[in-house]
Every structure is written in structure tokens, then in C-alpha cells.
């Protein structure tokens, strides 16, 4: 574990103006790394994110015989035979949900014994529904606790057929099955059950990346896809900036009435979290009810921004936030109440933020327990732009997805004190 250092964000008294380039998308980078590792040949991934989550994915690929070179700070060059070797050790993936779920399904396509494991936080994050789905497909796989570690005995390829999985649970399970399906023994149909598809936009990201690497995917209605067993071919692939990271900068601009140039328009993003830009643009008149089901990683940003809104905001469709890097609903509620008692309340799996614009310009003594969750650390820094006395615990946890976050704020004139 990282030592529990503390960082204090000092309020700003002027609009934030400048240019900041967000890092590459974590979601797309880890999809591209996986697909490049499954492809035959050499792929060049540009605009990529270099962070804790992408590091563990690239290191796992290296352990299985894939060559992953890093010629600069935003490029991966991946050379693979398309066949992975079982390593002598467990694949340790930290707290990277994308790497853990994507690799768990992909490993069923190869011969050998594999163990997928993570840190103490990842060992609390569910993977049972994906394991159950793979078991129904005939894969010899187990995760006794319903969370990592996961043991997989690969037999050289997923069986052809049809698999159903509840689309409400996690889009990462769906994406994992889709990406693995192209390397199986025959066509695989992945069908979603449940009343809604959670974070459908991330499934669309997966399908676009698969097709860029040569997969043949046919939509069957609105909630099923047939993936042909074509495998993948190497390609050059450019990764757009991270929309979740952009939300902090959009919110900082809104809070300070500034002008921060990200080098890319909000409507140019393909990631679902970019939907948050429209809500941020409505500040301080954000809607009374916000459905977060399709932009879950943006909810921490919006929740802190809502504290300064002109009316209370209820966040719905966010139950999956309870099984992210931490229970983000509780972490957000606790952090907001550390700033002002009663500022937020949990109601079932909804979060209600009782807006109080008068908080701006006040002084508190709020120690924010981030639970080593990068998004909790980054979103509460926004509160520090308007309120004196916001202290962020374990600030270096931002390295999971945005290692340069504190430097980015400093470049805009924000004083951060350790």
C-alpha cells in the first residue's frame, strides 16, 4: 500500500485559463493492448495512457510472451504471435478492473494453467458473473470467493455457441466475452439479459476496437452480437484522450468560470463519460435528477460539482458504483459530509446532494478519505478550488489513470501543497 500522504488544494481567486492535454483513454488503451496481444503481427498504439492500470496489462502480456515496447510516453508497440504461454506465476493486475476481467475471458483461448489475481482492493471486486458465464461455456475456471484470484485451465479455445449474461451487472463482463469470442473455436453469440444494458457506451467502444483489429461482429437486434472466430490482425491504432479525466477539467472550468482548452471538443469523444459535458455546461443549474447508468465514472465529478449547484441533485442508476475501486456512493457521501454535515445522503443506491452554493469562499477542515480511489481523490480536488481546508488523503492514487493530474492543476495556477 502507498503511504497515506495528504495533499491540500488551495482555493483559486480567478478563472482557470490555459491548455491541458488529458492523457489517453484508460478504457480504450486496455482494450487496444489486449487486442494487439491477441493479434498476429506488430501493432502500434499511439495516444495511449501510461498509468498503473495500463502498466499491469502490458506487464501481464509480457509475462505470456508478447513483446511490448514503449518508445515514448504515449506509445505502445506490441508484437505477438497470437499465442500466449502460461507463465510460471500469477498475473498480478493490481486494482485494474479492465485488465482483470478482459484477461480472464481471453485466457480461456490458450493452453495451460493461469491465475489472475490483484491487490487487496481487487480481491473485493466481483467477477463471479463472468466466471459463471465462462463455466456455462465449458471453461474450467474457478473463483471461490466470487472475486479474484481466478484460476483458469485453458484448453485452447472457447467453444462455439451462445452465452447469455445479465447486461445490468457490468459492461466489462460483456466486453470481455465479446473480445475473447473472436479467438474461439467457432462463432460465439453473446446475448444480454436484464431490463437495461449498463454502460452500453462501453460495449460500443469494445465493438469499435474489435473491428479496427479485424474482427467480424454482427449485431442481432439491440442486445446480442455474433462474433466470428476470425482472430485479430495487427494494426496501427490511435487512442483518443480520456473522457473521464476530461470531466475534472470541464468541472474546474465551470466552477471558476474559466476557459480550459483540452485540445479536443467535448462532442468529439466516443467514450460515454463525455455525456457529462452537457450536464457540466448547465452548471449552476444542473438537473434535479441525473441518471448515471451510462456515464458512471463521471458521477464523482458531477456529485462534487452538485454541491455548488442552485438546487439539490439526485443521482440514480449508479448502483454499480458500490463495486468500483471502493464503494463510491458511500465515499462520495462521506467526503461531502466531511465538508458540511448533511450535504449528501444515501437513499438506497441513490445519492442525493443537497446543494449549497454558499459553501464557496468558506473555510473548513475536511480530510477526504479517498480509499485509495483515484476518482475520489480527483473529484474532491474540485471542492478545494472553492473551499479552503480540503485535504486529500493518499493523493498519489491518481497514478491509476491520471499520473499527471496534480501537475495539470498546477499548470493552470492551482496551488497544491503536500
From Swiss-Prot:
Keywords: Amino-acid biosynthesis, Aromatic amino acid biosynthesis, Cytoplasm, Transferase. The keyword Amino-acid biosynthesis applies. The keyword Signal does not apply. It comes from Pseudomonas syringae pv. tomato (strain ATCC BAA-871 / DC3000). Belongs to the EPSP synthase family. It is found in: Cytoplasm. 3-phosphoshikimate binds at residues 26-27, 31, 170-172, 297, 320, 324. Monomer. GO terms for cellular component: cytoplasm. The active site is at 297 (proton acceptor). Catalyzes the transfer of the enolpyruvyl moiety of phosphoenolpyruvate (PEP) to the 5-hydroxyl of shikimate-3-phosphate (S3P) to produce enolpyruvyl shikimate-3-phosphate and inorganic phosphate. It is an enzyme of class 2 (transferase). InterPro entries: Enolpyruvate_Tfrase_dom (IPR001986), Enolpyruvate_Tfrase_sf (IPR036968), EPSP_synthase (IPR006264), EPSP_synthase_CS (IPR023193), RNA3'P_cycl/enolpyr_Trfase_a/b (IPR013792). GO terms for molecular function: 3-phosphoshikimate 1-carboxyvinyltransferase activity. Disulfide bonds: none annotated. This is 3-phosphoshikimate 1-carboxyvinyltransferase. HAMAP family: EPSP_synth. GO terms for biological process: amino acid biosynthetic process; aromatic amino acid family biosynthetic process; chorismate biosynthetic process. Its EC number is 2.5.1.19. Pathway: Metabolic intermediate biosynthesis; chorismate biosynthesis; chorismate from D-erythrose 4-phosphate and phosphoenolpyruvate: step 6/7.
